[in-house]
Regions:
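Catalytic cores of secreted or luminal carbohydrate-active enzymes
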Residues: 1-12
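Short beta-turn/strand-loop junction motif enriched in small, turn-promoting residues
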Residues: 21, 75-77
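Short coil-to-beta strand junction motifs in C2/discoidin
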Residues: 27-35, 85, 173-175
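Extended low-complexity, serine/threonine- and proline-enriched intrinsically disordered segments
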Residues: 29-58
Length: 202
């Protein structure tokens, strides 16, 4: 069997024939998904307790970093290049950049490998759909890097500056408005603003 990897390359190619196929986006109207946001995973920080509550309330177990986005074609197909030997999860995004689903598992491509699937968590017994799709007639898309570059993200770095700029004039710990100031942390490292805003954001 010929080797499908090219060890001198640093990227793999990923191809999805129709993102609306399968259980992953069941019930999502065609045309909703405009792009995919790709995340990679990081190792847990040194001496981190083996408990997802140390990463965030109701969050995943993993520390993530944003790699970027790639466009989805009108017919639901997508093909893109992404770093090889890197666990990647995928978020389908709507026209406003809002995630309509989250891939809870991950996929990894070897250098130079082409990784393909029919859709989003389609049945393992489903065969390729016999049709030509838009993405297969183009070169693979390159990642559009996120604002600020490839990086991990945290509440303190991404959300707290917005609260400081737009909210704490009223939500300053005085009166009836709940406190959205940053800085103070509890025993698990959660700030006052994080704990107060969490019940309203899921």
């Amino acid at each position: 069997i010929p080797d499908r990897v090219k060890l001198d390359e640093k990227e793999a190619t990923f191809f999805i024939q129709d993102i609306y196929e399968g259980e992953g986006l069941k019930g999502i109207p065609r045309g909703t998904v405009k792009a995919l946001r790709l995340h990679a995973y990081e190792y847990a920080y040194l001496k981190t307790t083996s408990d997802h509550n140390w990463h965030g309330i109701q969050s995943g177990w993993d520390i993530k970093r944003i790699l970027g986005t790639v466009p989805v074609e009108e017919d639901g197909s997508v093909m893109f290049k992404a770093p090889a030997n890197t666990p990647i999860s995928i978020q389908p995004l709507d026209k406003d950049g809002v995630a309509v689903q989250w891939m809870r598992s991950w996929v990894t491509g070897q250098p130079g490998e082409i990784v393909s699937c029919v859709g989003c968590h389609e049945s393992q017994n489903q065969v390729v759909i016999p049709k030509r799709v838009i993405a297969s007639q183009k070169k693979p898309a390159s990642l559009t890097l996120p604002e600020g570059g490839v990086r991990s993200f945290t509440f303190d770095l991404e959300v707290q500056p917005i609260l400081d700029r737009a909210c704490i004039a009223c939500h300053n710990g005085e009166g009836k408005a709940f406190d959205l100031r940053g800085g103070k942390k509890d025993g698990q490292g959660y700030g006052t603003s994080y704990l107060n805003i969490h019940p309203y954001v899921h």
